């Protein structure tokens, strides 16, 4: 008889900065900036988490982030931060709430200890392939610090009980509340120390058949692998030790914002622009956009009132992003200073296939591979990717500068599509999702002992 799988999250004694230091300690996640940027952002702030998550900045510029001394320096700094009282461990096992507000929209995450075995058995579901070298780098970091310094980002199906609990806390004064530099988003943080609330959270997660990794596949893999490794090395392993859990922030799926993740390509694979446009007509309806229907009512809740405007007028009045593809299977192409609409013809995709129906897959198969000869998005140097917040202006800039020949804008993937793919055991095509806002690091840390 197969045991019904369920999620086994638990509270933990978080390690975190005192209220008055949080803005000095907190940082962006390790993988959204390079060493030079981290060095510049840390500046002369010795309390910056970058000294732990980008520890190469503690050495001469040019020092490899994979140098053994660099990992050791992360552990030394983690010890130093605790000794100096810049990070302190809570006395009680508890949950935490982390909220982010972007453009007036707030998403509320529960910070939990996720169970390593739930990851190993596939109850925590992934949708991305991980690279062994990147896993190994994160594993070394977890091992040497003996902690999950940065959280991973999970989604769960909407849950009314948890939502009510979150809203109740949202009405109270947060422990941390600040606007982050650079992204300008608001970040708030509450401690859930009430025993009844802790029991409710644990019980509600236990009813869920699965959790979904949204962002942080390499960190999840590394945390789980180190946990499993420690279990093997401990002759008195019970399954209750802290290393059996890793830190995750879990958001309701409907609250998450996924932005478009667009493509820019260096050349047309030997074709002229006319030949390329002609080749597209096999699988797409190609429309030269010289005018666009714009909702000019100005009232989001009211009846939309569309007016046809010349493309240049629409852009000057509403900004370039007014052109973004409004529907699935519609794309925007920028080539030779002009914008084109591409609409995938019926029969070029399979609505029943959770992968084949994705615009990232349609564009990869029918444009990048079939016409442009780009087979592997991860390794081909002719293509690059422009995430979400930079908008269509960045696509136009990179083509107009001559660096790239063409740009392709896609409609964003939905959270439901990600969950469908994870449920079917399939893997998303590369460079498909761009979540925003990103989690800040340094608000909370989970020790493995």
Model regions and ranges:
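Surface-exposed, charge/polar-rich loops and edge strands
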Residues: 1-4, 8-449
């Amino acid at each position: 008889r197969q045991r019904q799988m369920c999620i086994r999250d638990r509270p933990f004694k978080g390690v975190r900065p005192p209220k008055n230091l949080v803005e000095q300690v907190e940082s962006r996640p390790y993988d959204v900036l390079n060493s030079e940027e981290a060095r510049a952002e840390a500046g002369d702030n010795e309390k910056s988490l970058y000294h732990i998550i980008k520890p190469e900045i503690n050495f001469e510029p040019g020092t490899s982030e994979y140098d053994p001394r660099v990992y050791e320096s992360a552990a030394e700094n983690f010890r130093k931060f605790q000794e100096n009282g810049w990070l302190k461990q809570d006395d009680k096992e508890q949950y935490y709430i982390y909220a982010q507000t972007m453009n007036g929209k707030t998403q509320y995450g529960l910070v939990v200890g996720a169970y390593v075995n739930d990851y190993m058995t596939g109850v925590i579901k992934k949708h991305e392939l991980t690279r062994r070298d990147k896993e190994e780098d994160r594993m070394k970091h977890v091992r040497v610090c003996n902690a999950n310094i940065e959280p991973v980002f999970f989604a769960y199906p909407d849950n009314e009980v948890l939502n009510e609990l979150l809203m109740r806390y949202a009405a109270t004064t947060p422990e941390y509340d600040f606007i982050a530099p650079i992204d300008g988003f608001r970040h708030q943080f509450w401690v859930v120390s009430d025993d009844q609330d802790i029991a409710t959270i644990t019980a509600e997660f236990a009813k869920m058949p699965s959790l979904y990794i949204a962002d942080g596949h390499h960190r999840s893999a590394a945390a789980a692998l180190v946990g499993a490794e420690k279990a093997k090395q401990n002759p008195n392993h019970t399954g209750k030790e802290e290393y059996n859990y890793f830190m995750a922030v879990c958001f309701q799926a409907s609250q998450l914002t996924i932005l478009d993740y667009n493509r820019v390509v260096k050349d047309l694979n030997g074709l002229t622009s006319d030949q390329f446009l002609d080749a597209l007509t096999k699988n797409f309806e190609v429309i030269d956009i010289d005018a666009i229907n714009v909702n000019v009512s100005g009232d989001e809740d009211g009846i939309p009132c569309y007016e046809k405007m010349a493309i240049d007028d629409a852009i000057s009045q509403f900004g370039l992003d007014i052109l973004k593809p409004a529907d699935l299977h519609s794309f925007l192409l920028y080539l030779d200073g002009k914008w084109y609409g591409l609409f995938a013809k019926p029969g070029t995709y399979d609505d029943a296939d959770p992968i084949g129906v994705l615009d990232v897959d349609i564009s990869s198969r029918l444009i990048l591979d079939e016409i442009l000869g780009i087979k592997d998005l991860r390794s081909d140097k002719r293509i690059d990717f422009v995430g979400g917040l930079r908008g269509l202006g960045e696509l136009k800039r990179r083509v107009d500068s001559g660096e790239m020949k063409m740009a392709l804008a896609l409609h964003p993937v939905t959270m439901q599509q990600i969950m469908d793919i994870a449920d079917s055991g399939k893997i998303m095509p590369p460079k498909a999702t761009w979540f925003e806002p990103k989690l800040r690091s340094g608000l909370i840390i989970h020790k493995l002992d």
